[in-house]
Amino acid sequence: MKSGKFQTKGFKFKQFCIEGGESGMPVSTDGVMLGAWMESPSPAHILDIGTGTGLLALMCAQRFPDAKITAVDIETTAVEAASHNFSHSPWHDRLSVQHTDVLIFSPPQRFQRIVCNPPYFNTGEQAKQSQRATARHTDSLRHDALLKCCYQLLDAEGKASFVLPITEGELFIELALTQGWSLSRLCRVQPSEKKPVHRLLFELAKQPCDTQESHLIIHSSDGYSDDFVRLTHEFYLKM
């Protein structure tokens, strides 16, 4: 996947590799946490919205051996990277990627689970690199439209999992509740014990339900916390 253009740094996990190509989308801790934290029935059809390099789809394929995963992205370079990563994974027969805007995506079936690391820069200048600007600037996929789209793509018992910074996450959840969603799971994430919550992992359900709440601290005084290691050890090489 080499060319004269900027190449995004790759990343090796225990069972698969991520090559970023020209996507401008490096592997993020947010994405790894979400992929490790989300839950899914088995078997299931899972949709990864805004797949980027395919990280979440690949994590789902590893965790849920009976699931079929469809990934969509609007960026050509992202689709190229995801397609490469899928084809070189052990689960290539259960993974597919489509170059499309999810707002016009019309699949033949509904999904039991959706996973998405949404864009969240609501203000300020767009990122200098155009692909990352598309990946992270809310104008490319507004949250209200994303929620309505997810609601239509899920089956009646379906759920959708997301990760966002705390301010954007609280606004996203508030908006979801006004649209008829229920908050089924919520995990507040702190970078360390002495730092405040900076991320929310959350799951939305179409059916009424109670909220299961939890808490995660990423770093302890001597490295990653035991909880973070337990969550991600199936993926990171050195855990």
From Swiss-Prot:
Reactions that this protein is recorded to catalyse: adenosine(37) in tRNA1(Val) + S-adenosyl-L-methionine = N(6)-methyladenosine(37) in tRNA1(Val) + S-adenosyl-L-homocysteine + H(+)
Alphabetized Pfam families for the sequence: MTS
GO cellular component, one term: cytoplasm
Protein's UniProt name: tRNA1(Val) (adenine(37)-N6)-methyltransferase
Enzyme Commission identifier(s): 2.1.1.223
Keywords: Cytoplasm, Methyltransferase, S-adenosyl-L-methionine, Transferase, tRNA processing
Leader peptide range in chain numbering: none
Alphabetical list of CDD domains matching this protein: AdoMet_MTases (cd02440)
General function of this protein: Specifically methylates the adenine in position 37 of tRNA(1)(Val) (anticodon cmo5UAC).
Subcellular location: Cytoplasm
InterPro entries named in the record: DNA_methylase_N6_adenine_CS, SAM-dependent_MTases_sf, Small_mtfrase_dom, tRNA_Adenine-N(6)_MTase, tRNA_adenine-N6_MeTrfase
PROSITE patterns in the cross-refs: N6_MTASE
Family, as annotated: Belongs to the methyltransferase superfamily. tRNA (adenine-N(6)-)-methyltransferase family.
PANTHER family: TRNA1(VAL) (ADENINE(37)-N6)-METHYLTRANSFERASE (PTHR47739:SF1)
Biological processes annotated in GO: methylation; tRNA processing
